[in-house]
């Protein structure tokens, strides 16, 4: 009987059914990821569940694409799942580069909160697929919005990694030797061998996380730049103007300036230690305002037309 109910729910509303399933997978994965901080044998289970979550989100988005007939990133509900898909992908790629239980332990809570927000806080009418207005029926929708959402995912991962560096070193001075250019755990030694060969040195745990944070933010910055460029081209084609200072456009530009300043200080000024980690961590809130915060206004071309119904919750 229970199995029959699952089948009926899947057939009737596959998108919502898979969405709830993803929430429960994350709910299971959260305590396992915290346990893995003390018992590394649990890390393989965390990675397996994360892969399943990533695949289920892909299945959900493909299902919505088939049902709606357009790329499934046209409303807040769809974009939240796409964002978590990007974060889980980033989590898996970063873990492949440097395996540590800290990475899923900091990423999974954000993934769970995001999916919980999409499942249980958003109004039901915002979860439904709707027909696109003529201006959005463009191949630029796929290119622009997906690139911007992936940039958010990369920037969020970078901020979370920097936060983990600060947390690990909260009671001691933070001295990092990691290279801003991200040389993958190698650094030019001050001493040379008899054969004039530059020898690699091992980075500490915090230095590895700091380097990964820098790399993630660099990827996110490049994607955000591409997102702004494609958005400007699309806006000119659709509305005849490259830039309209829409609230979302303005905050996307502020985010771009913020991370440009961070990268400039890391590369040109050689920033090391606590200051760049604090700046990168605060970038999480910049992205949060850019992505979610402007929707409080309920205005602009990029708004989903929804103001947080907090007064309806009481």
Swiss-Prot record:
Q: Can you cite a GO biological process for this protein?
A: cytochrome complex assembly
Cited Pfam families: Cytochrom_C_asm
List keywords of the entry alphabetically: Cytochrome c-type biogenesis, Membrane, Thylakoid, Transmembrane, Transmembrane helix
Keyword Lipoprotein in record: no
Name the InterPro entries on file: Cyt_c_assembly, Cyt_c_biogenesis_CcsA, Cyt_c_biogenesis_CcsA/CcmC
* The keyword Amino-acid biosynthesis appears for this protein: no
Q: Please list which residues make up the signal peptide.
A: none
Main localization, broad class: membrane
Q: Where are the bilayer-spanning segments?
A: 15-35, 48-68, 73-93, 102-122, 148-168, 216-236, 250-267, 277-297
Membrane-protein topology:
Multi-pass membrane protein
Among the GO molecular function terms of this UniProt record, one is: heme binding
Annotated GO CC locations: plasma membrane-derived thylakoid membrane
Subcellular localization, as worded in the UniProt entry: Cellular thylakoid membrane
Indicate the family of this protein: Belongs to the CcmF/CycK/Ccl1/NrfE/CcsA family.
Q: Quaternary state and partners of this protein?
A: May interact with ccs1.
Q: What does this protein do?
A: Required during biogenesis of c-type cytochromes (cytochrome c6 and cytochrome f) at the step of heme attachment.
Protein name (Swiss-Prot/TrEMBL): Cytochrome c biogenesis protein CcsA
Upper taxonomic classification of the species?
A: Bacteria, Bacillati, Cyanobacteriota, Cyanophyceae, Synechococcales
